[in-house]
Amino acid sequence: VNICVFCASSLRIDRKYVDLAAEVGAELARRGHTLVSGGATVSCMGAVTSAARAAGGVTVGVIPQVLVDVEVADTDSDELIVTAGMRERKGVMDARSDAFLVLPGGIGTLEELFEIWTARVLGIHDRPLVILDPWGLYEPLRQLVSGMHAEGFTRADVFDAISWTTTVEEAFAHLEARPQPVRPSIAELGEATG
């Protein structure tokens, strides 16, 4: 299975997030999966890829040219794909992935999450989408989306399209399972994304 991991590139975060990314990379490789990532060597991105490789895993990095130019590209990736920009990068990562795992991250990670989550809610794909959130960083996001539902901006099944987990083991159990498809009716399509 090709598992795409969305995660942080910030150098200012607590070490526990980097350690979590490394644990995920090692576990991904141990289970025989291929890692698809943002193709950078820094922070959580670097930790997940280097740990996956150290555990014998295959890594595919997808990085825009602008980040290659500032020398953060993971040139040790088994396959490094350089894109013209960020939108193309997300498209390639999406196309190359059978499942998606979201680790704690910043607004770039949120952008990636929302694109894949929205496509799942709309029934465009039925691949597993999992958030691994051991320390509750994304809990305000869950509350925000619940509030949006309470106000009528989303359907209740918006949470059927995603699995919220707190341990690496639980995250992989969801990544390796086939989730139920989310199939909105035509009447619901306008409600799917607000």
Task: Tell me the role of every PLM-derived stretch.
Residues E88-G123, V130, P181-L189:
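Active-site/ligand-binding-proximal alpha/beta "capping" segment
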Residues V1-R96, P134-H174, R178-G194:
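A cross-family phosphate/adenosyl-ligand binding-site feature
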